[in-house]
Amino acid sequence: MTAKTKPAPDIATLTKPKAKVELMRLRLEIEGHDKAYYQDDAPKISDADYDALRRRLEAIEQKFPELVNASSPTQTVGAAPARGFAKVQHAVPMLSLGNAFADDEVAEFALRVQRFLKLDDVPAIVAEPKIDGLSLSLRYENGELVRAATRGDGFTGEDVTANVRTIKDVPNTLKGKHIPATCELRGEVYMLKQDFLALNKRQEEANETVFANPRNSAAGSLRQKDVTVTASRPLKFFAYAWGEMSDYPMEEPTQHKMLQWLDHAGFVVNPEITLCHSVEDALAFYRRIGEKRASLPYDIDGVVYKVDRLDYQERLGFVSRSPRWAIAHKFAAEQATTVLEKIDIQVGRTGAMTPVARLQPVTVGGVVVQNATLHNEDYIKGIGNDGEPIRDGVDIREGDTVVVQRAGDVIPQIVSVVMEKRPAGAEPYHFPHKCPVCGSHAVREEGEAVWRCTGALICPAQAVERLKHFVSRLAFDIDGLGEKQIELFHERGWVQEPADIFTLKARNAELKLEQLEGYGETSVRNLFAAIDARRSIELHRLVFALGIRHVGEGNAKLLARHYGTLDAFLSAMRAAADAQTEEGNTSEAYQDLDNIAGIGDVVAEAVVEFFAEERNIKALDALLAELTEVLPAEQARRDTAVAGKTVVFTGSLSKFTRDEAKAAAERLGAKVAGSVSKKTDYVVAGEDAGSKLTKAKDLGVTVLTEDEWLALIGN
């Protein structure tokens, strides 16, 4: 990521009026980046670019101190808390640190401390890795965790107590003796590099947003409205500081003694932290940790130096937005220059087509980099997610000399192009409109940056996930054929597309499934019987099983009920697909599809794109040849007491399963919802009904027992 700026005027030549204008521009730009970083967890520029903006701001304010005001980023910390979480006032402000970028700046810091304290020598300093995560304050009363808050703007943060209780590294009760009655303990929430990569892989497979780096993933995971999402994320916590303390747990407290106490109290303290007795020791630590940086399991972006004695810290105090007794020694951005030899397209399990830069091998931060993500078509063209130019609008071409940076020490990315070295014959990159794996045509939906392969049924890159979907509970639901079996059969080449499932029995003389570990003649016979039982399938299950983008269970039922029979559905879809053009679709078949209540343009276009791909039609025809019957959709009745009503089922139902209840309600014309709202007409509550029942009562929604529901529907 690079800052998007025009050539800035030389500070030495600035007049006061011009300085005022430049300060206003810098303050607005920095405030925007602070919001993106602290509130949105989506920084738009690199740390190095951000630091450069701040240093320019500080230099101009130093030259024109009369232009400094209270709202300047040099006088504030972070950004105001985001909406959605309760606000928490910090008893002791969580201020940010001043930065040093060179050894002599660290030496100047140490000399300032020595002079301020009027000491003969530089005092002892604690050096610790600067974790690239999210700052957190934990308030304990009588040893019990009562509140957790983010830093926010340094004075007011967000209450994230419920989410923090799911982090294993944060004790709910402090251990040991000498626990202060009140203590605010602070540290950093972070995510290990390997956990970040695994999370992003799961996000991609689930067709969810992937995170740019471990810091963003940690921040986004902590600030979830749904605590179960936070609990599912592998968050870690390092303790390293404190705020309000009713008293200290030892006499003559020091920084390193307090860190030892935090360790005994049940926190994880970074084992790399070192007590240094000179500036030379501190700088040696900086160099040593810098060399280890690439091999550390977590991200760091520098080293923090803190005066060890707490009485010295108290005497030194604070200046504007940072303490006098601490400073952050930042690492330079890890970048290198190399040649982009080729752009390849990778196809994910959901059909997403991602461009990857193949680079001449280059070492960045101690790691050999040969590939870099190019994200999507717009990124290659020099367009950001917000539609604004990135890299000053410069596109990326094969043959370009590029600057590569390891973002967050994990994902290599291209941050700029060396235009002076662009080959004369370099052509703009044209994103492929066909899948490089299966040859199916690709589509890019309006409002999205990603191109997707439409060969859902036949693309090898998508096969495993599509086949798992095909046999899932709401689709064909074949007993004995789950995700593990699909993975095994696909790996052996036995099942590549849905029709192959129904030919397993005919091919078993060659395959010999009964010889597989965990199988025998009886289990294989049962599997074949379960497959044969599904040769007759309801239309809505078949439509859902096809794995068409945006067609979930609900939309599959809408389509099945509208068309009624398989023949009518296929005839309409083929007619709409035949009329599809780049300019759009004005056919009667498409208009009929688009006008189905609850479908709309996005779903209609996805369905037509599926049927416009001949390879999908071929795979579907092969499947239908193996089926004996596709049952017509049962039309919802309109003459019942619940027709047109919205119903929610909650709790443990004893007279029917949840699926049976849902199916019966839909046959009677009711709409079954998953959550309670003002639009809900009935809530049917079984045993141990929880929050949905409570909400229904609060909203005045009619609550029925199972017997009352059965009486209402006349059963």
Curated annotation (Swiss-Prot):
Keywords: DNA damage, DNA repair, DNA replication, Ligase, Magnesium, Manganese, Metal-binding, NAD, Zinc. One of its GO terms (cellular component) is cytosol. Its EC number is 6.5.1.2. The active site is at 130 (n6-amp-lysine intermediate). It comes from the Bacteria. Pfam families: BRCT, DNA_ligase_aden, DNA_ligase_OB, DNA_ligase_ZBD, HHH_2. One of its GO terms (molecular function) is DNA ligase (NAD+) activity. Belongs to the NAD-dependent DNA ligase family. LigA subfamily. This is DNA ligase. The gene is ligA.
